[in-house]
Amino acid sequence: MRDSDDVLWNTATLTRLLEEDAVGQLRRRDGKMAELGSENGVLKLDWVEGVARLPADNTLLEEVEEEARELWRSGIRHLIWAGMGGSIITVRVLDELGFCSGDQGIAIYPLDSTDPAALNAIVRRIAQSKQLPLPSTDTTHAFLHTLFDDVMMVGVSMGMTSEEPITHLTWFVELLEQAGITPAEHLLVMTLPGSYLDQFARERQAPSRPLQLDRGTGTGGRMSAPTTRVFLLPAALYLTRENDATGQLRAVLSKAWQYYDLDLATSAPDEHPFVQLAAALYTASVAGACRLLLKMPEGWSALVAWIAQLMEESLGKGGEGVVVFDEQPLQPQAPGFYGDDILHVRVVTGATPQDDAFYTLSLPYLTGQEPHERLAAVAASFLGWQLSMALYGYLHNITFAGQPAVENYKARARALRALPDPLQAVQDWQATVAGEHLTLLAPTDVALHGSPASVFASVLQQFVQDGQERLGYLDFTFNGDVSREASQSVAARWHHIGNERLGVPVKVRVAPADYHSTEQSEMDGPPYLVSLRVLSREHEKSLLGTYSDTFLRAQAVSTWQAMIEQGRTCFLLLIDGSPGQGAHILETFLDEVSYSISKSNQ
């Protein structure tokens, strides 16, 4: 349905939400909303009214501000934030918006990778800030002490089974001990009781703080902002250095709650922008699936990754869900183009000319310039998108709590890490085609005729030519850190293949971070994707301490295996050498894929 039919359907959807009191159910935590918002029978809806509850308490928010001041008074100037998914993506948003730079305060370094290169990059940044040259040979006690005496690592896990922060903390503790620094004074853990990370903290006697200020456990990781310490502590670290007055977090959350206006969503849902958005997504969806192409105002693009995690991890289940992309131009004459489940959303801050190609989401509060206003705007945006997500789940009867599919690859990775080399697990894979300096592992039903590039291109062509299965989008995933230049080069080629040659949107992801944010959807959400995962056979060695690429390799293999088991069209491309050495090989591969498709389209 489109045009006038869409308007009628959208109106009917808003009427349904009002008559069934969907927002009221969410707030009361009852009815179908309680069922959809529960994981293993346990309610995970503390986030719904969390912002209303916190300012009502006289001390909780001020305690977080005092924690921030105490970190400064203790001499901490650099804070490595180690976590995955919802435990860190909010911090990445705040970092990109300028709240973690450490200008006159504590610098925050997000760490969500098992690639030694990510640790090396943080070490280099801290050393550079101190004008401390890295030694070319073995590090000395004095060097490590100077480097780390004002550094703290915060290990965060809002799930029970995340192990990456444990590997980061283990690496850091080893270096602190070599430096003669007491680890307990430079560690902080925030996690759920009984989690893997909690067990680690207890064994190491590391200081810990509850994620929810009220010590509750009813907030899923992707709902961590703005009601848990994942948002509140970085915000407090920034605010208390700008101005030492108390009550700043209270003011930010109160303003965000005012912007959000959940009372309006309850009493008049047809007037609330995020309820309207949920209805529009539902109207655009086909068989429970919707592709959302999102255009943010200047300066706010950092929110897209957060929104993608929220939507895809929450709703990507049973072949349904919302898949989120940056706005990108699709060639309507391309053989794979279709638009009947796409919603182009343009977020605006004020009056703008009508554009029929976009659904317009008006958020005037994004125009604020002062730090308090911008933090409130970020928080209000988080709340609004969470509401849209829950209502879409309600309309399609999707359980939006939990992310069961990803436990498959986590268990596999755990086993693969015990091997001398996790790639041993795929060395005898039959659906393998080798080229010069690269090897492509394919699903078993793929015909292996020609080069790796031609094999991959033929699968894409088959999707758009036989008409039996639609191609909804392409995913490209780097396993491990990659240079900006290589990322941009690959992204340009990938967009050309998807947008121009085939007429479909594309994703460019970096793992393992994105395995904790959008892999749930790729494994169990809308099945109409083709995914290409890339792993270099060699990676940087750790500059300091002991940290190998074994976990990274295990994650690359385990996620691919899990996708294959799930029946998804997923390829693993192994490239000889390091990411830098393999950049040209990868570019050539993608150019050959593009050329093969163009020949087929002629």
Language-model features and meaning:
Residues 325-378, 491-496, 507-509, 513, ...:
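Helicase-primase coupling helices
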Residues 1-73, 377-382, 387-396, 402-408, ...:
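Extended, charge-enriched "interface" segments that sit outside catalytic cores
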Residues 475-505, 510-512, 518, 524, ...:
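Extended C-terminal subregions enriched in glycine
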Residues 515, 520-524, 543-556, 561-570, ...:
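Expand to "…catalyze enediolate/carbanion chemistry for C-C bond making/breaking, isomerization
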Residues 175-345, 354, 386-504, 516:
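Active-site phosphate/pyrophosphate-binding segments
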Residues 81, 153-155, 189, 293-294, ...:
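Structural beta-sheet core signal
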Residues 73-266, 343, 350:
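Glycine-rich phosphate-binding loops that contact phosphosugars or nucleotide phosphates
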Residues 63-77, 125-151, 277-290, 449-474:
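Glycine-rich phosphate/diphosphate-binding loops that line cofactor/substrate pockets in enzymes
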